[in-house]
Amino acid sequence: MKLLAINGSPNKRNTLFLLEVIAEEVKKLGHEAEIIHLKDYEIKECKGCDACLKGDCSQKDDIYKVLEKMQEADAIVIGTPTYFGNVTGIVKNLIDRSRMARMGNYRLRNRVFAPVVTSGLRNGGAEYAAMSLIVYALGQAMLPVSIVENPITTGTFPVGVIQGDAGWRSVKKDEIAINSAKALAKRIVEVAEATKNLRES
């Protein structure tokens, strides 16, 4: 089983930390995990030309490199901080530009999927950003999963919050987010193994 974790933050701080927790847990379970940073790829905004209705995107940039990695993975996690209650611009470019994968016979179908979100504020729109990613996954015929461990010590999916009771903190201090990241890794492996035949057919 191979996990691709996509860091949709322009920085390598809180979102990356949670992705690293997930990747390390997946490796401990005997599987492969890779983290990529969207900021290292040139993915321009969608032009709305609809070339992808008949074939590949008309813009020849790094979207092809990222989609290739996504297609090679059994499971995909997209991590994003919340920017005004939604995903970052570079994540939205990935979402829009990967339309050709959907139009090209659902090339990402049956990949296990989960969102990871970080937010500056406790009520900073993390759940809305996560839902945007889940809707994207459903549109690509992926298989979104949630955490199935103790709902008191974990969330439905990892949400790291920088705003603490005593002021600002690092997500590294958010125990619920860390517990959730570890639990999500286990769930991803479980579902990926159970659905392996779907990706091989």
From Swiss-Prot:
Keywords: 4Fe-4S, Flavoprotein, FMN, Iron, Iron-sulfur, Metal-binding. The keyword Metal-binding applies. Coiled coil: none annotated. Gene3D superfamilies: 3.40.50.360. [4Fe-4S] cluster binds at C46, C49, C52, C57. Signal peptide: none annotated. GO terms for molecular function: 4 iron, 4 sulfur cluster binding; metal ion binding; oxidoreductase activity. It holds the Pfam family FMN_red. Binds 1 FMN per subunit. Its cofactor is FMN; [4Fe-4S] cluster. Redox-active protein probably involved in electron transport. Homodimer. Belongs to the SsuE family. Isf subfamily. This is Iron-sulfur flavoprotein AF_1896. It comes from Archaeoglobus fulgidus (strain ATCC 49558 / DSM 4304 / JCM 9628 / NBRC 100126 / VC-16).
